[in-house]
């Protein structure tokens, strides 16, 4: 009996010692990230990553150094450590480092090497994603605007000029980061090749050339990987690279890795972007995702030994003009990149943070379960600055918009921003009109926000967000002056539309009916005035003496406003701009970002590290003009207040087609209705004969589960050649039910994002009707349908009909 007890005691002691040894080993391995002089290894093993030869689960926090003021970098890194993360994941943004061709900047807030050194100082490894394309809801996906000065350039392809510039950029990044790879004693354990290329195209030779470029810079020993979605990763997967998946909270994780497991059963699994929330766009509600779904997904992955990078762990702010835009259509992103992440925009812990931290205590530093014990995570650091408020104050100094001019071209025809060697800001286009004694319609493709004036009087606007391309003009006399103020917003960062020129990108056609004949004029001579959106231009404008420019180019209220506020103590604050129109804000010389009264973002985050005791300066460039030029600082952000001219819903009664006498398309299976299968993944439904029409109407008769709200993640149509039709021209025509509070509107079925979805309102039962305008008459041979990505594919449609007209 005593022998058995002694044996049990010895076994228990051995287990405890082994557990202790494992914990010590994990701690030692993690701490080794801070030992810059010790070379290490990071490789793939049998179903696991190997750090210095030992199994290792990557628990990465995605953070972006340009979205965080440099004085706050270390605090944000410590916040990630306090969540139990062992790695930081970051993009390298080409266009912030090479804003003008050949001029590289890796200093100050662009010092990516210093950010990596701070990670190592705080016992964290680093995964680097150097593009060249990064997406990230960032201007042009990180590609520099000046590439578009070569109008025929083929972006993200083996275009000779594009690849030449890519290799120069990657070499410059390598000079900064190669000394910091794990083989050289640094924290960098992996480098990503390109980014989600399967969502862009299929071009293994291009992806291979990017791989070869990076391998030549960093050496054969450093682990290279590529990320994509489970639906498209095979398109460009290279045999000698590690493959990782990107998906969002709530996704069916086994389903996401199913195909990878079939192809590479012994490979480690990693979700390289596990989306904690989502990004916001102007004119739509603030995006949120449930904490419980995020935490449950991460817990499931850790329990199965699956590595991850939480995108975003801390989103930060797209300061200045760096916020991008989504596509199809044009959906510009707001300045805040809060992302509903566990660490909010201003670096504080959210309820998500605490729920996640509690779960992460179950796992050790290397990502392995502690067997029911609760581990000890690093302490949550104190915020570097307090939150302060600022009393309301008025911006009293004013100069009209045109005083910001830095270049005038008086000859020639229309030119885009890029043809004017102009990256960001606004342009004024001017021309003289012919005699048109009746009302006329002006048609033009303008990127992005245009305001029209005749002899200085405002006559209307077009907004690319709303796909507006026409405006009605009043009768005019010969010689009347037409002015068009065009503001360029963030360039598209996702999909084929990243080749996003700014300004007037087509002819301007003015059409009128006179004596029963339609007559069209296309003005050929245009004045072109550049108005940059940088701080120095704003200061010059406000200091310029008044002259006769005001007479011709001073649309009422549009221009530069300056004011001052005094602080007794410094801290972070949120300046409120809900009484303003649209434009840019500068505080003490720092470009804080875009504002737009439509919301949902009404405040800008102002870091205390960029403020000072005493007098602080603020300049607002408002291209529309404020209702009242006042600002105040509040203690919390306002990220979910819309001020729209009309609802985002697409349910105008006049847009609903009458299908009572219409004949639905016949499917290849026979009959005028089809039945979708339950479960996740793409499904294709072919028509018995090609269908023709400009509009497609989908009538959903039932869902897989009674009582479910109906939902669709993505739709594609196949053309006569069996290939997917471009969705760039598509617009929403009608939906009988949409949940706009959660941004589950009709446009989500063609937004190129498999994790977002259209969904009906809670009380709405089938049948439902969706109508999409394809932009032109199309021949359609099949419909592709993707249900929601969550377990069980909630809201999946079952029986449905399709009409084209």
Regions found by a protein language model. Give the residues of each.
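Aromatic-lined substrate-binding rim segments of carbohydrate-active enzymes
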Residues: 73-139, 211-219
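Aromatic- and acidic-residue-enriched segments that line the glycan-binding/catalytic groove
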Residues: 102-110, 121, 131-157, 207-211, ...
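Catalytic-core region of carbohydrate-active enzymes that cleave or remodel glycosidic bonds
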Residues: 217, 250-344, 348-351, 355, ...
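Active-site neighborhood of glycoside hydrolase catalytic domains
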Residues: 162-238
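Short beta-strand-plus-loop segments that form exposed binding edges in beta-rich domains
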Residues: 484-490, 620-627, 699-706
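Disordered, acidic Ser/Thr/Pro-rich linker "stalks" and the adjacent N-terminal cap
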Residues: 411-412, 545-548, 588, 656-692, ...
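N-terminal carbohydrate-binding accessory modules
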Residues: 26-87, 117
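Aromatic-lined ligand-binding clefts that engage carbohydrates, nucleic acids, or primary amines
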Residues: 439-453, 482, 565-588, 595-596, ...
């Amino acid at each position: 009996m005593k022998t058995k007890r002694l044996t049990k005691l010895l076994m228990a002691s051995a287990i405890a010692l082994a557990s202790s040894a494992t914990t010590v080993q994990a701690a030692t391995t993690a701490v080794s990230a801070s030992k810059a002089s010790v070379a290490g290894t990071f490789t793939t093993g049998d179903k696991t990553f190997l750090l210095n030869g030992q199994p290792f689960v990557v628990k990465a926090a995605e953070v972006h150094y340009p979205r965080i003021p440099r004085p706050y970098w270390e605090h944000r890194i410590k916040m990630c450590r306090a969540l139990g993360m062992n790695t930081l994941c970051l993009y390298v943004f080409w266009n912030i480092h090479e804003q003008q061709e050949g001029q590289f900047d890796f200093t100050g807030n662009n010092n990516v090497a210093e950010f990596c050194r701070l990670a190592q100082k705080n016992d964290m490894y680093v995964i680097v994603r150097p593009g060249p394309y990064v997406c990230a809801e960032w201007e042009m996906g990180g590609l520099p605007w000046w590439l578009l000065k070569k109008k025929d350039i083929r972006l993200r392809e083996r275009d000779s000029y594009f690849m030449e510039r890519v290799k120069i950029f990657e070499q410059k990044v390598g000079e900064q980061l190669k000394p910091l790879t794990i083989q050289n004693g640094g924290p960098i354990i992996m480098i990503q090749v390109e980014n989600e290329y399967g969502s862009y195209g299929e071009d293994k030779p291009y992806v291979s050339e990017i791989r070869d470029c990076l391998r030549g810079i960093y050496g054969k020993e450093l682990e290279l990987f590529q990320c994509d979605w489970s639906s498209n990763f095979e398109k460009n997967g290279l045999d000698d690279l590690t493959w990782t998946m990107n998906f969002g909270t709530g996704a069916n994780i086994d389903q996401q890795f199913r195909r990878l497991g079939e192809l590479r059963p012994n490979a480690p699994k990693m979700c390289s972007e596990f989306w904690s929330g989502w990004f916001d766009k102007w004119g739509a509600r603030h995006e949120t995702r449930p904490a419980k779904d995020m935490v449950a997904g991460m817990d499931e992955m850790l329990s199965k030994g699956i590595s991850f990078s939480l995108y975003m762990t801390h989103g930060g702010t797209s300061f200045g003009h760096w916020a991008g835009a989504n596509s199809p259509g044009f959906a510009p992103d707001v300045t805040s990149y809060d992302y509903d992440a566990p660490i909010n925009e201003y670096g504080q812990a959210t309820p998500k943070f605490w729920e996640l931290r509690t779960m992460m205590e179950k796992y050790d530093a290397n990502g392995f379960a502690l067997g029911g014990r609760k581990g000890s995570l690093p302490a949550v650091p104190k915020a570097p600055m307090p939150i302060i408020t600022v009393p309301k104050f008025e911006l009293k100094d004013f100069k009209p918009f045109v005083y910001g001019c830095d270049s005038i071209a008086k000859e020639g025809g229309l030119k885009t921003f890029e043809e004017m060697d102009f990256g960001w800001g606004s342009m004024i286009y001017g021309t003289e009109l012919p005699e048109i004694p009746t009302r006329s319609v002006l048609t033009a493709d303008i990127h992005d926000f245009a305001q029209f004036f005749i002899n200085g009087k405002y006559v209307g606007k077009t907004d690319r967000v709303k796909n507006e391309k026409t405006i009605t003009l009043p009768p005019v006399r010969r010689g009347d002056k037409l002015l068009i103020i065009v503001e360029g917003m963030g360039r598209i960062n996702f999909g084929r539309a990243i080749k996003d020129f700014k300004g007037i990108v087509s002819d301007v056609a003015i059409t009128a009916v006179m004596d029963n004949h339609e007559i069209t004029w296309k003005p050929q001579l245009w004045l072109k005035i550049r108005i940059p959106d940088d701080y120095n231009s704003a200061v010059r404008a406000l200091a310029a003496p008044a002259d006769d420019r005001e007479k011709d180019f001073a649309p009422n209220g549009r221009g530069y406003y300056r004011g001052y506020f005094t602080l007794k103590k410094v801290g972070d604050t949120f300046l409120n701009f809900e009484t303003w129109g649209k434009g840019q804000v500068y505080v003490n010389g720092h470009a804080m970002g875009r504002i737009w009264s439509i919301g949902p973002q009404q405040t800008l985050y102002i870091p205390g590290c960029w403020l000072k005791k005493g007098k602080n300066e603020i300049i607002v460039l408002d291209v529309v003009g404020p209702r009242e030029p006042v600002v105040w600082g509040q203690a919390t952000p306002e990220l979910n207040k819309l001020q729209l001219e009309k609802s985002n819903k697409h349910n105008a009664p006049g847009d609903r087609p009458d299908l009572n006498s219409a004949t639905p398309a016949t499917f290849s299976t026979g009959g005028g209705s089809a039945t979708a299968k339950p479960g996740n993944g793409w499904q294709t439904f072919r028509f018995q004969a090609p269908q023709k029409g400009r509009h497609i109407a989908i009538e959903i008769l039932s869902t897989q589960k009674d009582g479910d709200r109906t939902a669709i993640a993505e739709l594609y149509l196949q053309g006569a050649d069996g290939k997917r039709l471009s969705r760039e021209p598509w617009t929403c025509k009608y939906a009988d039910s949409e949940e706009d509070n959660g941004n589950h509107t009709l446009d989500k079925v063609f937004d190129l994002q498999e994790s977002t979805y259209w969904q009906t309102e809670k009380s709405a039962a089938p049948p439902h009707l969706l109508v999409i305008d394809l932009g032109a008459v199309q021949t359609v041979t099949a419909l592709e349908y993707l249900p929601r990505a969550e377990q069980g594919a909630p809201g999946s449609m079952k029986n449905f009909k399709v009409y084209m007209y």
